[in-house]
């Protein structure tokens, strides 16, 4: 398959290398040509399973060149980059292409809405995963280490009516697990569950320099807040009628006896900690805050509210991160009301997510 991979971060490197090693024709796009010289000779993937030096079909700063002939466009970029990305994609997409966001934080709906509002071309479908396919860190100009891969990758499609055909194309690439729709996948994203508590409750240590929030920063007290947020996420999912698996953090990530049922499989947390790659310098500009807190938590809170599920821990985190960032987070970012869905009932939103831009309600949400 011809695959375009957009971005130059750790996730993009891991994606491009892994898919190229799997035999796909991969072209990588980055905004600046000066950033591409290092990968034109290939990207080295250090990982369990598939690994080695991956040769790319091309590496280019010309987005049109990267997208030309690509059946699949993978965007392993933070959700904070989606606004810029959609402006670039608008004139170039074709109605045969699939755009995959890894993960999406409900970006599949947000990007489709933004494209429609600005007159851009809509693809065949948007898809989004509920988590990162790889837990990875770049370790050199053309090297990336991915000690952990997703083994269960919840994947939602917008419009959900096109799920069968989209997942049939994605299944040879990833261990996709069918989600009901894009919001189902977005509410499986545990980044907003784990990262905001880890950052907030370790703020003092983080201010002191390099620190591993997943190791020293994960104490019993921190876990209590993570578990509370996850409990509210599960209540929201049930309120929306989404079926299991819910990928509960307490049992499918922190509990080794059930980790095989989780997003990353047995031993995932141990592999992450043993790698030492997450002993790093964090700040309020890190995606743990700008993406997982500002966007992910705002989505969780609004989804809970729409489903009449209580979310005091999520709301409290939003208020505190709003103070730290100096701006209001509640009702903004990826909150449903910020995406034109605030006036719709839960059942109307689910119908819209299924029918997509063919729905009579589409014109209301793109005003």
Residue spans of the language-model regions?
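NAD(P)+-binding Rossmann beta1-loop-alpha1 motif at the extreme N-terminus of oxidoreductases
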Residues: 1-48
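Short, well-ordered alpha-helix to beta-strand connector turns
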Residues: 23, 56-57, 70, 96
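Short acidic low-complexity segments
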Residues: 55-69, 179
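Rossmann-like NAD(P)(H) cofactor-binding subdomain of soluble oxidoreductases
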Residues: 74, 79-142
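Substrate/ligand-engaging "lid" and interaction regions
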Residues: 133-229, 352-366
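Small-residue-rich helix-loop
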Residues: 222, 230-272
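Long, low-complexity C-terminal extensions of enzymes
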Residues: 254-258, 266-353, 360
